C-alpha cells in the first residue's frame, strides 16, 4: 500500500529539516567566530557583507524553488515567527560590553536598547496576532519594520565605528570587540537569522492581508 504523508507529518519533516540546517549554520558560525572572519583594520568590511549575503541568497533561492531547506520556516504561523525573536533580548550583552568599556556607547546603546525593545515586545505582539485582536495586523507590520530598522541601524553603527575602511566615526574606542568571539556570534548568526525571520513574517502578512 502506498504511504500517504499527512499534512502534520509533512510539517514535522519540514521543521526538522530546517532545524537541522539552523544547527549546522550555528556550528559553522561558531567556527567562523573563532577564526576572525572580519579582516584586518583598515580593510573594507567584506566579511560582514558576505556573512549577511550568503544566508539571504540561500533563503531567497530556496523560497523561489520551494526547496526543503527553509520550508519549516515558511510553514510557521505568523505568531510563531514573531515570538521566536524574543531571543533579541540578548542585545543586553552590548550594554554589558559598553559598561565594561569594550564597546563605544554610540554603537552599543542604540543596538542594545533596540534589540531589548524588539525582544521584550515580541511575545506581546505574537499574543495579539494569535488572538486576532483588533489592530494586530498593523501592529505586526510596525513591529517587523521597527525590528529591521533596528538591525540596519546596528549594522551601520557597528561598521562606521569600527577600524575598517568604512569606520568614519571610529574613535579611541572602536566597535571592534563585536567582531571577536563570543560577541561576533551576534553579527555572524543571530542578525542574519533575525532578518530571515522578519522577511518570513512580512511575507506571511502580505500573503494573508485579511487575517494575519
Language-model segments: residues:
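Hydrophobic alpha-helical membrane-insertion segments
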Residues: 140-157
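Membrane-interface helix-boundary motifs at transmembrane edges
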Residues: 6-11, 38-41, 66-78, 131-138, ...
Amino acid at each position: 500500500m502506498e504511504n500517504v504523508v499527512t499534512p502534520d507529518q509533512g510539517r514535522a519533516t519540514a521543521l526538522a529539516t530546517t532545524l537541522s540546517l539552523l544547527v549546522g549554520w550555528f556550528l559553522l558560525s561558531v567556527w567562523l567566530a573563532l577564526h576572525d572572519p572580519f579582516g584586518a583594520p583598515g580593510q573594507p568590511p567584506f566579511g560582514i557583507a558576505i556573512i549577511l549575503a550568503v544566508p539571504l541568497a540561500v533563503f531567497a533561492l530556496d523560497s523561489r524553488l520551494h526547496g526543503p531547506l527553509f520550508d519549516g520556516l515558511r510553514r510557521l504561523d505568523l505568531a510563531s515567527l514573531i515570538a521566536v525573536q524574543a531571543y533579541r533580548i540578548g542585545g543586553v550583552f552590548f550594554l554589558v560590553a559598553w559598561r565594561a568599556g569594550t564597546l563605544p556607547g554610540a554603537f552599543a546603546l542604540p543596538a542594545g536598547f533596540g534589540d531589548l525593545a524588539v525582544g521584550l515586545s515580541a511575545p506581546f505582539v505574537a499574543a495579539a496576532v494569535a488572538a486576532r485582536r483588533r489592530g494586530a495586523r498593523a501592529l505586526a507590520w510596525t513591529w517587523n519594520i521597527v525590528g529591521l530598522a533596528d538591525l540596519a541601524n546596528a549594522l551601520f553603527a557597528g561598521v562606521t565605528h569600527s577600524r575598517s575602511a568604512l569606520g568614519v566615526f571610529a574613535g579611541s574606542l572602536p566597535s571592534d570587540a563585536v567582531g571577536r568571539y563570543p560577541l561576533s556570534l551576534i553579527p555572524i548568526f543571530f542578525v542574519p537569522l533575525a532578518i530571515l525571520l522578519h522577511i518570513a513574517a512580512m511575507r506571511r502578512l502580505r500573503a494573508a492581508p485579511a487575517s494575519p
